[in-house]
C-alpha cells in the first residue's frame, strides 16, 4: 500500500 500511512496495519 504505497498511499497508506499505516501500512503495517493493512498486512493480512
UniProtKB/Swiss-Prot annotation:
GO biological process terms on file: neuropeptide signaling pathway
Sorted UniProt keywords: Amidation, Neuropeptide, Secreted
Cellular-component GO terms for this entry: extracellular region
Location in the cell: Secreted
Membrane-spanning residues: none
Region forming the signal peptide: none
Positions bearing Phenylalanine amide: 12
Protein name, per record: CalliMIRFamide-1
Family: Belongs to the FARP (FMRFamide related peptide) family.
Keyword RNA-binding: no
Main location, first listed in the record: secreted
Organism of derivation: Calliphora vomitoria
Taxonomic placement: Eukaryota, Metazoa, Ecdysozoa, Arthropoda, Hexapoda
Amino acid at each position: 500500500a504505497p498511499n497508506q500511512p499505516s501500512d503495517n496495519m493493512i498486512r493480512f
